[in-house]
């Protein structure tokens, strides 16, 4: 690796600033190489967070040849940050996972092309331009594609999802058509999930009227419990969004130029618009693998080591489907955090240290306009019979805390947070250790991660629990830096034990 210079320094990872030290020669001196893995050619299909993280961690441990292939873009970027480019908060270059110099200096080769076919017998890829590419080990990290359900008119200009960089570019072009309509300007968004509400906020930031069609009787109610879902319903409408629940798309019609002009609903309503956003979920992007011989279901089937049915082929990220997911986890998790973890895990295995994928306690976060959302652990939309819940909501209706716990013994199982930030390490420790709800409430200030001078709500939450359960639990102390540091220090010592 004499041609690869040592690189130290900070790197922008999406909207997170992290320090990565790529001191390869030093790391090699401290990492025992496996002779069987020397000099391999590793090909990664996809350059999202899963594929990029796999490449990064393989490079930190080995000098294998690494080639990344993506049809979508030359420069890997943070998909979750695309909305902020449209809203003017970021420039496109700010979404790049790494600086421009990162790839060459770390000897990561990139090819911008589509993979048409995988030949598992020849260990060869056939690319769109007719070229072939051999591999010793293959990592499939090809992500997802937006769902379409055969609606009439779904191929008209101005009808799209929001997943790829090209979608953002198309959305910018459609915005010109919307604004040209003057007082008749309107965007219609179909689908009550995270991408749908992101798209609504994007148009709202440019003062474009939005109609939001949600099939369910409340926003994202297959994930959020009723109280939180209703809070977001209100919040969406507070922003002037025309939220229509229990409403489905039936047809999209266009004008003579092939552009969307109207949307028809199941209630017979006709909504004039210049844009129709289809945000009804995503599916693994695996059509090119149908004839490969690799076992598929909804996604690419993998075991706990992220191995597919074929030797030397792995799958990670949105396209991977675990055959036996851990308790509390789904077989397919199209989430940034899981893609990142999968990339690091498969890198360990490829570098000779076979490592099972153990994602741990479920975590996710999102933002609904002005309300931040976090979930740790098991907080289903419908409370199971073996659980109880403590739900507190601020009178203003924009903040809430939910803590689920077992009826027998009171062990805490999950946290749902709206507009309030809790420390992930603290919540996960309580869940892992099956800490009783009473002990959690006594020490709830340790979890609060809001800035120091923000108002704290632990006393109100505790008072509500006491009223509901006729108890007299009290906070053990106020939050302090020293207490939180000691708690996290103990956590670190236990993890290293």
Regions found by a protein language model. Give the residues of each.
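FAD-binding core/adjacent interface of flavoenzyme oxidoreductases
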Residues: 5, 22, 35-39, 43, ...
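Mid-to-C-terminal Rossmann-like scaffold of FAD/NAD(P)H-dependent oxidoreductases
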Residues: 37-41, 47, 319-425, 478-492, ...
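Beta1-alpha1 glycine-rich phosphate/pyrophosphate-binding loop at the start
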Residues: 37-108, 202-224, 426
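Residue-level detector of alpha-helix initiation sites
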Residues: 44, 48-49, 73, 144-146, ...
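A Rossmann-like FAD-binding core segment of flavoenzymes
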Residues: 64-65, 110-126, 133, 205-302
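FAD-site-proximal beta/loop scaffold in flavoenzymes
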Residues: 155-183, 256-264, 269-345, 436-444
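Rossmann-like NAD(P)H-binding beta-loop-alpha module
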Residues: 170-224
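Cysteine/selenocysteine-centered motifs that mediate thiol-based redox chemistry or coordinate metal-sulfur cofactors
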Residues: 438-495
